[in-house]
Amino acid sequence: MSLLKFAPKVALLCCSAILSVSALSARTVTDDNGDRVEVPEKIERVVVANILPLAAALTAYTGDGSIVAGMHPASYSAAKNGLLGELFPEVLRADTSFIRGAALNVEALMALEPDLVLVNAPDRRMLEQVRSAGLAAYAVSPSKWHYDVVETYRGWTASLAKLFPEANGKGALIEARTREIESLVADRTKDIAEKDRARVLFIVRLDEKEIVTSGRNFFGEYWCRAAGAVNAAHDLEAENANARLSMESVYGYDPDVVILTNFTKAVPSDLATGKIPGQDWTPLKAVEENRVYKMPLGLYRTFTPGADTPLTLLWLAKTLYPARFEDVDLALETKRWYKEIVGVELTDAQVERMYSPDRAAAEGASQGVRSTQ
């Protein structure tokens, strides 16, 4: 037999071997939409599209920011202005050019050669765009657990455990510490009479054009319930960031406490000094009693689920009921969490910055990210 006749057979055998190895090195996981997704045995390059907190959650879970090949600009701004980029500077090398708001540039995405793309689960159009390009898209849901922040964080951690089994035991450690904090807060707030529970108004977005709160179908409802408080806007049924208020409605609620998220550039002093055009917040009880607070900015914006969720619950409970948590050293608990869960040791200055974020925390955070429902 001549070498020329033999060559095609060798090539065919080589191709078959390569395909066999490829098949053996792939595995199938089920995402939050129930879709089966084939991923490599070891995932090394991930693009986080429009499920914004996942860039930080992924980095914290794996302990490696270089795994994030691309992320949404709104995720990047949180990384740059919060602790993520400081603790994992390699994450700031991630590309952001593949997406603008809800518009995905498929060619730019493909150029990143991701092993996996994480997509907001309700965004079927974007999932289809990614999969049609031959890329593995895993749907991550922000609402499957009915906006229960801790349960959502648990669900996301379960997904990360499936996708990154090499981080053996990380999920169990996160769960143990989360339950510890949950139990502490629940035990210390369970005997508060209904009439004595703090009435809290979350301000998700705020500027001269709009006031957006959390009604009963968004994360603010969970935060209030878990911390032993009452959501002042519980009567609003609008889901997600669609519960818009007039100033008259705010006066009607007259909450005991106002919590500003990091999806707005507003800071507590803006409400006290009338810096928001066309709005007067000064008559509110919360403003008069100096009980307007800005949520922490840790690895990501803490109103949403993420790697800082248990710490955020502890911060909120201590902020609402300082006497009941007087013995809790939040700085110490924060350092402990980051050392055990994230694998880094925070300085006093880093802890201070986490709990006193400035306007930059909201940079780029208000843009829409879903291409469709």
Place the predicted regions along the sequence by residue.
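Short helix-initiation/N-cap motifs at beta->coil->alpha
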Residues: 32, 93-106, 237-247
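Structural recognition of the beta-strand scaffold that forms the well-ordered cores
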Residues: 47-49, 69-72, 116-120, 137-140, ...
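Extracytoplasmic substrate-binding proteins
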Residues: 36, 126-209, 233-234, 287-288, ...
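Sec/Tat signal peptide C-region and signal peptidase I cleavage site
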Residues: 21-25
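Proline-aspartate-enriched helix->loop->beta-strand connector
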Residues: 99-101, 106-122, 246-263
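Alpha-helical, coiled-coil/dimerization segments enriched in small aliphatic residues
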Residues: 214-242
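A short, structured surface patch at a secondary-structure boundary
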Residues: 48-111, 116, 232
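Bacterial N-terminal signal peptides
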Residues: 9-20
